[in-house]
C-alpha cells in the first residue's frame, strides 16, 4: 500500500513537472523570494500592465517588483505579502485597487492555483492552502495541470520540463505577439488600433454588494503591514474617460466607498480618477481596451507620474 502511494505521488509530481506551464507568476515568486525589494506592488491586471517598477525606481530610487495579476484577490495578496515577509523585508506595499474585485468571488480555475503553485515550502504556503486551496475541487489540488488545455501544453512538454529542471527564468519565454513580460514583473502591452476596440462591461462595483471576505483580507493585510512596520499605499489607476462616463454611477459609488474605507484605516489612497484625475490622460489612445489596461508607452509615462505623487505624499507625511 505504501509503495502504491509513493508511486502515485511520484507520478503526480512528474505530470505536474511536465504539464503545468511556466507562467509569469513562476518568475514573479522566484524573484521576490530570492531578492530584496523596497516596494512590492500587489493587485489586479491594471496594476500589472500600468505600473513599471523600473521606471518608478528612476524617480524614487526605490527598487520594486510587480506582483499584480488578473484574478488576484485580497486573499492572494495577503498570502503573497506574508510569503515575501518570510523571505525578505519590504519597506512598502503598493496595493492597486480595482473596485470590481470587491463585489465578486474568486472563481475556481487555473487562476486559483496561479499563485499558490509557485510558493516554496513556507508557513505562508501552509496557511494559504488551508484557507483557500483546500476549498477547491479536489482535481485542482491533485491535478493542477488539468485546468490548462493539453492540446496547448503537450507540444511544449520538453521546453516546460527543461525550464523547470534547469532553473531557467529567461523572460523571453513569456513574450507573445501582443505583450512582453519584464524582469520587474511588469507586463508591457503593445499599442493597438483603438478605433477597432469593442466595448465590454468591466467588473463593476455595486453599492451594497461588497463581498465581506474580500474586504476582510484587505483589512488583514493592512493590519499585517502595521504589525511589521511596512508602509502601505492604495492606488487606483486611471480608467478611460469613455468607460468612466458609461458607468459613472458605479464608479462614483466605488470612489466614495473606498475613499471612506481607507480614511478609516489610516491608509493613503491615491485615486487617479478623482483627486489625481488631471495628472494623467484618460484618452482611449493611451490604452489597449476600454477597461483601462495601458499600452507600454503610456504605462511608462504613468509610472513616472505615480512615482512623483508617491514621493510628494511621502514628503507631506
Question: Where are the model-predicted features located?
Answer:
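Active-site segments of SGNH/GDSL-like serine hydrolases
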Residues: 222-247
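Membrane-embedded segments
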Residues: 46-133
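Alpha-helical transmembrane signal-anchor/signal-peptide segments
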Residues: 20-38
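Secreted/periplasmic serine-hydrolase-like ester/acetyl group-modifying domain
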Residues: 112-228
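Hydrophobic membrane-insertion alpha-helices, especially the h-region
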Residues: 1-18
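Long, positively charged, glycine-interspersed low-complexity recognition regions
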Residues: 248-317
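Residue-level recognition of beta-strand->loop/alpha-helix junctions
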Residues: 68, 236, 271-273
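Short hydrophobic beta-strand that contains or immediately precedes a catalytic carboxylate
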Residues: 40-43
Amino acid at each position: 500500500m505504501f509503495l502504491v502511494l509513493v508511486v502515485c505521488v511520484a507520478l503526480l509530481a512528474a505530470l505536474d513537472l511536465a504539464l503545468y506551464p511556466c507562467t509569469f507568476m513562476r518568475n514573479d515568486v522566484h524573484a521576490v523570494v530570492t531578492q530584496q525589494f523596497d516596494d512590492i506592488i500587489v493587485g489586479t491586471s491594471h496594476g500589472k500592465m500600468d505600473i513599471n517598477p523600473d521606471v518608478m525606481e528612476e524617480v524614487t530610487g526605490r527598487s520594486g517588483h510587480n506582483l499584480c495579476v488578473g484574478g488576484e484577490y485580497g486573499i492572494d495578496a495577503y498570502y503573497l505579502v506574508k510569503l515575501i515577509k518570510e523571505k525578505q523585508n519590504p519597506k512598502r506595499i503598493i496595493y492597486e485597487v480595482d473596485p470590481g474585485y470587491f463585489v465578486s468571488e474568486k472563481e475556481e480555475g487555473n487562476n486559483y492555483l496561479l499563485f499558490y503553485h509557485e510558493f516554496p515550502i513556507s508557513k505562508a504556503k501552509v496557511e494559504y492552502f488551508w484557507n483557500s486551496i483546500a476549498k477547491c475541487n479536489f482535481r485542482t489540488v491533485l491535478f493542477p495541470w488539468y485546468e490548462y488545455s493539453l492540446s496547448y501544453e503537450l507540444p511544449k512538454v520538453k521546453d516546460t520540463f527543461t525550464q523547470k529542471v534547469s532553473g531557467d527564468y529567461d523572460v523571453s519565454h513569456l513574450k507573445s505577439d501582443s505583450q512582453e513580460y519584464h524582469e520587474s514583473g511588469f507586463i508591457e502591452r503593445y499599442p493597438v488600433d483603438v478605433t477597432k476596440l469593442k466595448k465590454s462591461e468591466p467588473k463593476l462595483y455595486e453599492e451594497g454588494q461588497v463581498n465581506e471576505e474580500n474586504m476582510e483580507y484587505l483589512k488583514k493585510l493592512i493590519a499585517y503591514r502595521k504589525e511589521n512596520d511596512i508602509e502601505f499605499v492604495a492606488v487606483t489607476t486611471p480608467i478611460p474617460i469613455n468607460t468612466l462616463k458609461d458607468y459613472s454611477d458605479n464608479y462614483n459609488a466605488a470612489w466614495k466607498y473606498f475613499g471612506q474605507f481607507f480614511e478609516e484605516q489610516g491608509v493613503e489612497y491615491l485615486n487617479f480618477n478623482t483627486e489625481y484625475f488631471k495628472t494623467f490622460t484618460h484618452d482611449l489612445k493611451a490604452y489597449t481596451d476600454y477597461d483601462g489596461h495601458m499600452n507600454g508607452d503610456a504605462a511608462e509615462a504613468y509610472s513616472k507620474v505615480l512615482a512623483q505623487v508617491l514621493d510628494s505624499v511621502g514628503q507631506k507625511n
